[in-house]
Amino acid sequence: MSAKIIDGKQVAQTIRNQVAAQVQQRLAQGKRAPGLAVILVGVDPASQVYVGSKRRACEEVGFISRSYDLDATASQEELLALIDKLNEDADVDGILVQLPLPAHCDTTQVLERIRPDKDVDGFHPYNVGRLAQRIPALRPCTPKGIMTLIEATGVKTHGLHAVVVGASNIVGRPMTLELLLAGCTTTTCHRFTQDLEDQVRRADLLVVAVGKPNFIPGEWIKPGALVIDVGINRLADGSLVGDVEFETARNHASFITPVPGGVGPMTVASLMENTLSACQDYHDNAQ
Protein backbone atom coordinates (compact mmCIF):
# COMPACT_ATOMS: atom_id res chain seq x y z
CA MET A 1 0.00 0.00 0.00
CA SER A 2 1.19 3.48 -0.82
CA ALA A 3 -0.74 6.33 0.76
CA LYS A 4 -2.45 9.05 -1.21
CA ILE A 5 -0.77 12.37 -0.47
CA ILE A 6 -3.17 15.01 0.86
CA ASP A 7 -2.23 18.19 -1.01
CA GLY A 8 -2.71 20.97 1.53
CA LYS A 9 -1.53 23.62 -0.93
CA GLN A 10 -4.25 22.70 -3.41
CA VAL A 11 -7.05 22.53 -0.82
CA ALA A 12 -5.89 25.81 0.74
CA GLN A 13 -5.83 27.51 -2.67
CA THR A 14 -9.41 26.39 -3.29
CA ILE A 15 -10.45 27.95 0.02
CA ARG A 16 -8.61 31.20 -0.70
CA ASN A 17 -10.28 31.38 -4.11
CA GLN A 18 -13.68 30.93 -2.48
CA VAL A 19 -12.94 33.64 0.09
CA ALA A 20 -11.70 36.00 -2.64
CA ALA A 21 -14.89 35.45 -4.64
CA GLN A 22 -17.01 36.29 -1.59
CA VAL A 23 -14.97 39.44 -0.97
CA GLN A 24 -15.55 40.56 -4.57
CA GLN A 25 -19.25 39.88 -4.11
CA ARG A 26 -19.24 42.06 -0.98
CA LEU A 27 -17.55 44.90 -2.80
CA ALA A 28 -20.02 44.63 -5.69
CA GLN A 29 -22.82 45.02 -3.13
CA GLY A 30 -21.25 48.20 -1.78
CA LYS A 31 -19.94 46.57 1.40
CA ARG A 32 -16.41 47.04 2.71
CA ALA A 33 -13.62 44.48 2.48
CA PRO A 34 -12.91 42.49 5.67
CA GLY A 35 -10.02 43.81 7.74
CA LEU A 36 -7.34 41.84 9.58
CA ALA A 37 -4.85 43.39 12.01
CA VAL A 38 -1.67 41.38 12.58
CA ILE A 39 0.52 42.22 15.58
CA LEU A 40 4.13 41.05 15.73
CA VAL A 41 6.23 41.71 18.83
CA GLY A 42 9.99 41.38 18.31
CA VAL A 43 12.00 39.92 15.44
CA ASP A 44 11.72 36.14 15.85
CA PRO A 45 12.67 34.85 12.35
CA ALA A 46 10.06 32.07 12.27
CA SER A 47 7.34 34.46 13.42
CA GLN A 48 8.34 36.93 10.71
CA VAL A 49 7.94 34.20 8.08
CA TYR A 50 4.51 33.20 9.41
CA VAL A 51 3.31 36.80 9.63
CA GLY A 52 4.53 37.45 6.09
CA SER A 53 2.52 34.52 4.73
CA LYS A 54 -0.61 35.74 6.52
CA ARG A 55 -0.22 39.26 5.18
CA ARG A 56 0.30 37.99 1.63
CA ALA A 57 -2.79 35.80 1.92
CA CYS A 58 -4.81 38.85 3.01
CA GLU A 59 -3.73 40.73 -0.09
CA GLU A 60 -4.52 37.76 -2.32
CA VAL A 61 -8.12 37.43 -1.12
CA GLY A 62 -8.76 41.17 -1.05
CA PHE A 63 -8.75 41.84 2.68
CA ILE A 64 -7.51 45.07 4.19
CA SER A 65 -4.34 44.02 6.01
CA ARG A 66 -2.97 46.14 8.82
CA SER A 67 0.50 45.48 10.20
CA TYR A 68 1.63 46.41 13.70
CA ASP A 69 5.28 45.53 14.34
CA LEU A 70 6.28 46.30 17.92
CA ASP A 71 9.80 46.32 19.32
CA ALA A 72 10.78 43.28 21.39
CA THR A 73 10.98 45.56 24.42
CA ALA A 74 7.37 46.78 24.03
CA SER A 75 5.61 46.58 27.38
CA GLN A 76 2.56 44.51 28.21
CA GLU A 77 0.65 47.78 28.68
CA GLU A 78 1.57 48.99 25.18
CA LEU A 79 0.41 45.72 23.65
CA LEU A 80 -2.87 45.71 25.57
CA ALA A 81 -3.51 49.35 24.64
CA LEU A 82 -3.07 48.50 20.96
CA ILE A 83 -5.50 45.59 21.27
CA ASP A 84 -8.03 47.85 23.02
CA LYS A 85 -7.75 50.33 20.15
CA LEU A 86 -8.26 47.62 17.52
CA ASN A 87 -11.18 46.13 19.47
CA GLU A 88 -13.01 49.43 18.99
CA ASP A 89 -12.03 49.91 15.33
CA ALA A 90 -15.10 49.14 13.18
CA ASP A 91 -12.93 48.44 10.11
CA VAL A 92 -11.05 45.63 11.87
CA ASP A 93 -12.82 42.26 11.86
CA GLY A 94 -9.95 40.14 13.12
CA ILE A 95 -7.03 40.69 15.48
CA LEU A 96 -4.12 38.27 15.41
CA VAL A 97 -1.21 38.39 17.85
CA GLN A 98 1.64 36.25 16.53
CA LEU A 99 2.91 33.73 19.09
CA PRO A 100 5.21 33.15 20.85
CA LEU A 101 5.43 36.49 22.62
CA PRO A 102 8.60 37.69 24.40
CA ALA A 103 9.04 36.23 27.88
CA HIS A 104 8.01 39.42 29.67
CA CYS A 105 4.54 39.35 28.08
CA ASP A 106 1.61 37.52 29.68
CA THR A 107 0.26 35.51 26.74
CA THR A 108 -2.96 34.49 28.48
CA GLN A 109 -3.83 38.08 29.36
CA VAL A 110 -3.05 39.22 25.82
CA LEU A 111 -5.22 36.57 24.16
CA GLU A 112 -8.09 37.21 26.57
CA ARG A 113 -7.94 40.94 25.81
CA ILE A 114 -8.98 40.35 22.19
CA ARG A 115 -12.74 40.59 21.77
CA PRO A 116 -14.12 37.08 21.12
CA ASP A 117 -15.86 38.27 17.94
CA LYS A 118 -12.47 39.46 16.60
CA ASP A 119 -10.51 36.42 17.84
CA VAL A 120 -9.85 34.95 14.39
CA ASP A 121 -7.10 32.67 15.74
CA GLY A 122 -9.77 31.00 17.88
CA PHE A 123 -7.65 31.04 21.06
CA HIS A 124 -9.93 33.04 23.38
CA PRO A 125 -11.45 30.88 26.17
CA TYR A 126 -14.91 31.89 24.91
CA ASN A 127 -14.28 30.40 21.47
CA VAL A 128 -12.53 27.29 22.80
CA GLY A 129 -15.44 26.86 25.23
CA ARG A 130 -17.98 27.09 22.44
CA LEU A 131 -16.11 24.37 20.56
CA ALA A 132 -16.13 22.22 23.70
CA GLN A 133 -19.89 22.70 24.03
CA ARG A 134 -20.47 21.70 20.39
CA ILE A 135 -21.54 25.17 19.28
CA PRO A 136 -18.37 26.37 17.52
CA ALA A 137 -18.04 29.98 16.44
CA LEU A 138 -14.50 31.11 15.51
CA ARG A 139 -12.54 27.85 15.57
CA PRO A 140 -8.78 27.50 16.18
CA CYS A 141 -7.19 27.72 12.74
CA THR A 142 -4.92 24.67 12.57
CA PRO A 143 -7.49 22.13 13.85
CA LYS A 144 -10.14 23.73 11.63
CA GLY A 145 -7.82 23.40 8.64
CA ILE A 146 -7.08 19.78 9.50
CA MET A 147 -10.80 18.98 9.56
CA THR A 148 -11.09 20.56 6.10
CA LEU A 149 -8.24 18.33 4.87
CA ILE A 150 -9.91 15.25 6.33
CA GLU A 151 -13.18 16.18 4.62
CA ALA A 152 -11.29 16.54 1.33
CA THR A 153 -10.24 12.87 1.51
CA GLY A 154 -13.86 11.72 1.60
CA VAL A 155 -13.15 9.57 4.66
CA LYS A 156 -16.15 9.33 7.00
CA THR A 157 -15.08 10.11 10.55
CA HIS A 158 -18.05 8.79 12.54
CA GLY A 159 -16.92 5.89 14.71
CA LEU A 160 -13.24 6.12 13.84
CA HIS A 161 -10.69 5.71 16.62
CA ALA A 162 -8.75 8.99 16.45
CA VAL A 163 -5.48 9.56 18.29
CA VAL A 164 -3.98 13.00 18.83
CA VAL A 165 -0.32 13.06 19.87
CA GLY A 166 0.39 16.38 21.57
CA ALA A 167 -1.81 18.39 23.92
CA SER A 168 -0.95 22.03 23.25
CA ASN A 169 -3.58 24.75 23.51
CA ILE A 170 -2.96 25.71 19.89
CA VAL A 171 -3.33 22.29 18.24
CA GLY A 172 -3.68 19.20 20.41
CA ARG A 173 -6.49 20.15 22.78
CA PRO A 174 -8.77 21.89 20.26
CA MET A 175 -8.01 19.10 17.77
CA THR A 176 -9.38 16.62 20.28
CA LEU A 177 -12.56 18.69 20.55
CA GLU A 178 -12.91 18.89 16.75
CA LEU A 179 -12.57 15.12 16.40
CA LEU A 180 -15.13 14.49 19.13
CA LEU A 181 -17.48 16.83 17.29
CA ALA A 182 -16.83 14.83 14.11
CA GLY A 183 -18.00 11.62 15.81
CA CYS A 184 -14.63 10.02 16.55
CA THR A 185 -13.70 8.05 19.64
CA THR A 186 -10.74 10.22 20.56
CA THR A 187 -7.59 9.62 22.60
CA THR A 188 -5.15 12.41 23.43
CA CYS A 189 -1.54 11.44 24.12
CA HIS A 190 0.93 13.71 25.92
CA ARG A 191 4.27 13.60 27.71
CA PHE A 192 2.87 11.45 30.53
CA THR A 193 1.36 8.83 28.20
CA GLN A 194 3.08 5.53 28.96
CA ASP A 195 1.79 3.33 26.12
CA LEU A 196 2.27 5.66 23.16
CA GLU A 197 3.09 2.93 20.64
CA ASP A 198 -0.02 0.93 21.57
CA GLN A 199 -2.20 4.02 21.23
CA VAL A 200 -0.75 4.99 17.85
CA ARG A 201 -1.06 1.46 16.48
CA ARG A 202 -4.81 1.54 17.22
CA ALA A 203 -5.42 4.83 15.42
CA ASP A 204 -7.66 4.87 12.36
CA LEU A 205 -6.98 8.61 12.24
CA LEU A 206 -3.70 9.94 13.64
CA VAL A 207 -2.85 13.61 14.24
CA VAL A 208 0.69 14.32 15.46
CA ALA A 209 1.71 17.77 16.74
CA VAL A 210 4.76 17.61 19.00
CA GLY A 211 7.49 19.48 17.11
CA LYS A 212 10.03 16.64 17.18
CA PRO A 213 11.49 15.35 13.90
CA ASN A 214 10.41 11.81 12.94
CA PHE A 215 9.06 11.30 16.46
CA ILE A 216 6.53 8.65 15.40
CA PRO A 217 8.13 5.65 13.64
CA GLY A 218 6.38 4.81 10.38
CA GLU A 219 6.13 1.17 11.45
CA TRP A 220 3.64 2.18 14.16
CA ILE A 221 1.03 3.32 11.64
CA LYS A 222 -2.04 1.10 11.44
CA PRO A 223 -2.60 -0.26 7.91
CA GLY A 224 -5.07 2.00 6.13
CA ALA A 225 -4.87 4.82 8.68
CA LEU A 226 -5.28 8.49 7.81
CA VAL A 227 -2.21 10.39 9.04
CA ILE A 228 -2.07 14.15 9.65
CA ASP A 229 1.44 15.43 10.42
CA VAL A 230 1.35 18.93 11.93
CA GLY A 231 5.05 19.15 12.75
CA ILE A 232 7.56 21.11 10.70
CA ASN A 233 11.15 20.62 11.80
CA ARG A 234 14.39 21.75 10.15
CA LEU A 235 17.25 19.24 10.24
CA ALA A 236 20.96 20.06 10.35
CA ASP A 237 21.19 19.66 6.56
CA GLY A 238 18.48 22.28 6.09
CA SER A 239 15.75 19.86 5.03
CA LEU A 240 12.25 20.01 6.52
CA VAL A 241 10.59 16.96 8.06
CA GLY A 242 7.47 16.34 10.07
CA ASP A 243 6.82 14.58 13.36
CA VAL A 244 6.08 11.28 11.57
CA GLU A 245 8.65 9.14 9.75
CA PHE A 246 7.16 9.85 6.33
CA GLU A 247 8.68 7.33 3.91
CA THR A 248 7.84 4.32 6.08
CA ALA A 249 4.47 5.68 7.19
CA ARG A 250 3.28 6.22 3.62
CA ASN A 251 3.61 2.47 3.01
CA HIS A 252 1.11 1.78 5.81
CA ALA A 253 -1.34 4.67 5.64
CA SER A 254 -4.20 5.21 3.18
CA PHE A 255 -3.79 9.01 3.30
CA ILE A 256 -0.96 11.16 4.66
CA THR A 257 -0.04 14.84 4.68
CA PRO A 258 3.41 15.85 3.41
CA VAL A 259 5.80 18.24 5.16
CA PRO A 260 5.95 20.91 3.91
CA GLY A 261 2.77 21.45 1.90
CA GLY A 262 0.27 19.67 4.12
CA VAL A 263 -1.17 21.31 7.21
CA GLY A 264 0.75 24.60 7.06
CA PRO A 265 -1.12 26.19 4.14
CA MET A 266 -4.43 25.17 5.73
CA THR A 267 -3.77 27.18 8.88
CA VAL A 268 -3.53 30.39 6.86
CA ALA A 269 -6.55 29.46 4.72
CA SER A 270 -8.61 28.88 7.87
CA LEU A 271 -7.53 32.29 9.16
CA MET A 272 -8.94 33.84 5.98
CA GLU A 273 -12.21 31.93 6.47
CA ASN A 274 -12.45 33.02 10.09
CA THR A 275 -11.84 36.67 9.24
CA LEU A 276 -14.54 36.62 6.58
CA SER A 277 -16.92 34.88 9.01
CA ALA A 278 -16.23 37.46 11.73
CA CYS A 279 -17.02 40.22 9.25
CA GLN A 280 -20.23 38.63 7.97
CA ASP A 281 -21.58 37.08 11.16
CA TYR A 282 -20.67 39.71 13.75
CA HIS A 283 -19.81 43.05 12.20
CA ASP A 284 -21.90 43.65 9.06
CA ASN A 285 -24.98 44.63 11.06
CA ALA A 286 -22.94 46.89 13.32
CA GLN A 287 -21.86 49.18 10.52
UniProtKB/Swiss-Prot annotation:
Catalytic activity, as annotated: (6R)-5,10-methylene-5,6,7,8-tetrahydrofolate + NADP(+) = (6R)-5,10-methenyltetrahydrofolate + NADPH; (6R)-5,10-methenyltetrahydrofolate + H2O = (6R)-10-formyltetrahydrofolate + H(+)
A Pfam family per the record: THF_DHG_CYH_C
Chain's role: Catalyzes the oxidation of 5,10-methylenetetrahydrofolate to 5,10-methenyltetrahydrofolate and then the hydrolysis of 5,10-methenyltetrahydrofolate to 10-formyltetrahydrofolate.
GO molecular-function terms, A-Z: methenyltetrahydrofolate cyclohydrolase activity; methylenetetrahydrofolate dehydrogenase (NADP+) activity
Record-stated family: Belongs to the tetrahydrofolate dehydrogenase/cyclohydrolase family.
CDD domains the UniProt entry points to: NAD_bind_m-THF_DH_Cyclohyd
Keyword set includes Metal-binding: no
Gene Ontology cellular component list: cytosol
Source lineage: Bacteria, Pseudomonadati, Pseudomonadota, Gammaproteobacteria, Aeromonadales
Annotated GO biological process: L-histidine biosynthetic process; methionine biosynthetic process; purine nucleotide biosynthetic process; tetrahydrofolate interconversion
Source organism (scientific name): Aeromonas hydrophila subsp. hydrophila (strain ATCC 7966 / DSM 30187 / BCRC 13018 / CCUG 14551 / JCM 1027 / KCTC 2358 / NCIMB 9240 / NCTC 8049)
Enzyme nomenclature, EC number: 1.5.1.5, 3.5.4.9
Keyword annotations of the record: Amino-acid biosynthesis, Histidine biosynthesis, Hydrolase, Methionine biosynthesis, Multifunctional enzyme, NADP, One-carbon metabolism, Oxidoreductase, Purine biosynthesis
Binding site for NADP(+): 166-168, 232
Signal peptide: none
Assembly, per entry: Homodimer.
InterPro entries: Aminoacid_DH-like_N_sf, NAD(P)-bd_dom_sf, THF_DH/CycHdrlase, THF_DH/CycHdrlase_cat_dom, THF_DH/CycHdrlase_CS, THF_DH/CycHdrlase_NAD-bd_dom
Gene3D superfamilies the UniProt entry points to: Leucine Dehydrogenase, chain A, domain 1, NAD(P)-binding Rossmann-like Domain
Keyword Mitochondrion (UniProt): no
Domain of life where this protein originates: Bacteria
Name assigned to this protein: Bifunctional protein FolD
Cysteine disulfide links: none
Pathway per the UniProt entry: One-carbon metabolism; tetrahydrofolate interconversion
